[in-house]
């Protein structure tokens, strides 16, 4: 026996009564034969409908079995009930008001439904947009209308440029026309800005306009800041490619640096003193190298520019700071890395113009004590007039003594590297104690002898004293320094803390290969950098000599002007007095 599916829609009450009456009439018209041949139909199931009233109401198993356990004569009754049910469902579907195809075609704005063939990939039935309806998304390709969603505007435009111009002119406005609006009302956005440029830049987010194109690729962007961020990605890619290309060279340079650090930690000279004059850092400038030593390879040759390499004012400020540190005793007259760095910075100021300034230095005034350098070379810019820090009479003497000691120390270091070196005649200065101090109100104590400046002992083991023709003779006495045997032993001294434990002794004898390697590196360093050391220290000695000349001229100028001022005061006092004065001869 074939089974029929249950229909989803419910039946009207009248149709259900008709279906219940039809089986009863048919059962009455059946011929009565033998009692055994008559079908036995349950009265309880005859009064019930054969199908549930709604698809959600389930049928019980007893009802289903009762409906199925019928005789052959009741098949016609079931078929007639099913056909009647189909007819009633078709009539009910027409009564619910389904739209005919003709009606859908006559109404342009009516909603039409797609068949199973027209469903999209997600399984959802979408409503197709008619040809005459505008694009309400506010964005689209060329040829489609763009709707303005700024509040209740609703105007349509054929291109994104026209829509953007409409938003800027009609809705944003301008301050000069008194209609400036800094709140974005596009589809309830609500963004508030403080400038018109900000709101016009924000509107580009809503408008499908991308006028800013990338020169490196085919991408376009709505705002210039978006394009700027995108261009940085190209720059980062190029930098990564460059780093990948330069990686082997960088590894080679790193190996050289490690090799230099390995042998620089050991003493280079026999005395154990390592000179820092070619290892200091210069934060502002780079010391120009002598062309004859440019082929060594340790320092690159600086480029030749037609203008001044660095700012003169900044370097003169460095000179003034150096004098101020000397006054405040912040530095010591020892040729260290800090002093070498300061002198190299000052040398950039006087190194190019040193010859002109040494020939005719400009005097300084008493009030400002300004040092005006001589006219520079034709290719150099003349530095402006600068001022030295204010000096007292005692400060001049102390500063000059400091520079004298520093120059003697530098000269001793040069002699330790190059014993044949002699100071040039143009850089010789008299002893600082031979200067005339016109306003020295603090006389020297009676019987006190001039004390020569103390100079650090030279690093060369064979030189015990430094004697220059124009510098004071400085002797180094062995009796003043306690002689310790450990100073002359070729044994490395290592400091061990109290809490440290000595290493265990091993039976393996140490090899001398490391010592030979270190000694070879030391010889290479001496051979390569000896000439550079001497040249650098000579420049620093010239800088110290120049600073002493500037200081001496400033003191003499101030003394002369002070004498003139005192004479003028005496003359004015004699003129203003009512009684004659008698001066003692």
Curated annotation (Swiss-Prot):
Biased composition (Polar residues): 30-47, 54-68, 90-114, 124-139, 568-579
Xref: PROSITE patterns: ZINC_FINGER_C2H2_1, ZINC_FINGER_C2H2_2
Organism, as annotated: Yarrowia lipolytica (strain CLIB 122 / E 150)
A biological-process GO annotation: positive regulation of transcription by RNA polymerase II
Subcellular location: Cytoplasm; Nucleus
Subunit text: Binds to DNA. Interacts with RIM20, which binds to the two YPX[LI] motifs and is required for proteolytic processing.
UniProtKB keywords: Activator, Cytoplasm, DNA-binding, Metal-binding, Nucleus, Repeat, Repressor, Transcription, Transcription regulation, Zinc, Zinc-finger
Residue span of region Disordered: 1-68, 84-142, 353-391, 555-585
Span of the annotated motif YPX[LI] motif 2: 579-582
The name this protein goes by in its record: pH-response transcription factor pacC/RIM101
InterPro entries, per the entry: pacC/RIM101, Znf_C2H2_sf, Znf_C2H2_type
Principal location class: cytoplasm
Domain of life: Eukaryota
Zn-finger region bounds: C2H2-type: 146-171, 182-206, 212-234
